[in-house]
Design a protein with these regions (language model features):
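Serine-esterase "nucleophile elbow" of acetyl-processing enzymes
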Residues: 1-69, 74-75, 79-88
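Structural recognition of the beta-strand scaffold that forms the well-ordered cores
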Residues: 30-33, 62-67, 91-95, 130-134, ...
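Charged helix-capping and loop-helix junction motifs
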Residues: 107-117, 153-159
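Catalytic His-Asp segment of secreted/periplasmic serine-dependent ester chemistry enzymes
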Residues: 137-229
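A short helix->loop->beta-strand "cap" motif at the edges of active sites that frequently abuts
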Residues: 124-129
Length: 229
């Protein structure tokens, strides 16, 4: 329940302030979410920038990246007025869920926070295109404890089903599918066997992609956003 959640919603305030100090680029595709986005071009990690990987077809800039750390769905909701609204995006790409479980949020709380963000966005920006990113398969989910692994798989399946149900009711919302992308598995035939997610495209923590991982994600996101590029 919510009264058991003790996440400090301002623990990532420094990251938010840093984005606020950058020039506001209105009318772009705004990426908003957790560390899958944060590391995509962060100087700290030395990866190629997201705005280099995802560009307009004429080569001009297309995206603004507002990924921040271990953010939860509630933090994304909390910071929406500061990190989304001033940029007046024409499309919003949001990634959440991955950190919610370890801070005590259940699936419906995560989904409710996400739905509020999407509702606010379409209220603030009529005609905006909305994209929700599936949680991505990763080697860290594979453990020697069957109960833990089965629980993680069940949670991801439940979340994906909720996303698909939501998207069916809202034509302005599309799901960017990652869970069954062949490029993330050892062979295309391994899709669906989550013990065979490629390990070579992740850093040592087995959670976050390395540059080879982002080399795969770039085309996936470009394809999903093609009509806007």
């Amino acid at each position: 329940m919510l009264f058991n959640i003790e996440k400090n919603l301002k623990s990532l305030e420094d990251s938010v302030v840093a984005y606020e100090q950058e020039p506001i680029e209105k009318g772009k595709i705004l990426f908003y979410g957790h560390s899958l986005f944060t590391r995509w071009g962060s100087p700290k990690y030395g990866y190629r920038r997201m705005d280099e990987d995802i560009r307009m077809k004429d080569g001009s800039l297309a995206v603004v990246n507002h990924g921040f750390g271990t953010s939860t769905s509630e933090e994304l909701l909390y910071y929406y007025p500061r990190l989304v609204r001033p940029w007046e995006p024409r499309a919003l790409v949001i990634a959440t869920l991955a950190n919610d479980g370890m801070y005590g949020y259940d699936m419906m709380q995560s989904m409710q926070n996400l739905v509020k963000i999407l509702h606010w966005a379409r209220t603030d920006f009529p005609g905006i295109k909305l994209f929700v990113v599936e949680d991505h398969p990763r080697p860290s989910l594979i453990t020697s404890v069957p109960q833990k692994w089965n629980g993680a798989l069940h949670k991801s399946n439940e979340y994906r089903q909720l996303l698909q149900a939501y998207a069916q009711l809202h034509p302005d919302t599309k799901i960017i599918e990652l869970w069954n992308q062949p490029e993330l598995f050892e062979t295309p035939e391994d899709v669906g066997d989550y013990t065979k997610v490629r390990k070579d495209i992740f850093v040592e923590d087995k959670v976050h992609p390395n540059q080879a991982g982002y080399d795969i994600l770039g085309p996936i996101f470009r394809k999903a956003l093609d009509e806007l590029l």
